[in-house]
Design a protein with these regions (language model features):
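Bacterial N-terminal signal peptides that target proteins for export
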Residues: 2-11
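Intrinsic low-complexity/disordered segments
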Residues: 6, 21-23
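Bacterial N-terminal signal peptides
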Residues: 10-20
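Beta-strand-enriched cores of mature, soluble protein domains
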Residues: 24-165
């Protein structure tokens, strides 16, 4: 009798933890905008085709505003960008480190493909890979659309990406 009671209790706890884990995973889904500035080195592979390696960095603004997940957090993304203007195709990928005002960090990997022209859109996906502090154990994935507004003559770029919109 005591064994059955303990077994039921253990099953209840496991079920409760499973449900709360699912709810918590949903909490990591942010909706907002990341304004970025890209600095790096562009190499012309062939006329009209560039391969860029560098970093996109800026600030994330959560649509829910003050007190919401990652709102006004710093974002730094070491990355690569393959821009083929001849065929009007681009692809990119890398990692991002998201740091909030308290210094806690979340890490993710991302990839996208699209158009390299100014205003060109590149839909993609990201996956959380880990974190520190309150983001320890972060998991899940999301979608984003990266938009390059300007490819500057000095090899830098400016743009933004919308997350989960």
């Amino acid at each position: 009798m005591k064994t059955k009671t303990l077994l039921r209790y253990a099953i209840s706890i496991c079920a409760g933890l499973g449900i709360s884990g699912m709810v918590h995973a949903q909490d990591w889904k942010v909706t907002g905008e990341f304004g970025w500035f890209g600095v790096g080195k562009a190499h012309e592979v062939e006329k009209g085709h560039f391969y860029w390696v560098g970093e996109f960095s800026g600030t994330f603004f959560n649509d829910k505003g003050e007190g919401s997940l990652f709102h006004r957090a710093g974002v730094k993304c070491p990355a690569w960008f393959d821009a083929d203007f001849n065929n009007k195709k681009s692809k990119a990928g890398g990692y991002c480190i998201i740091t909030d005002l308290g210094g806690d960090q979340a890490y993710l990997t991302w990839q996208n493909a699209g158009s390299p022209e100014a205003g060109g859109r590149g839909p993609g996906t990201f996956q959380y890979t880990g974190g520190t502090g309150k983001y320890k154990g972060i998991g899940g994935n999301g979608t984003f659309v990266g938009v390059t507004q300007v490819n500057w003559q000095d090899g830098t770029s400016t743009g933004y990406s919308t997350w989960n919109r």
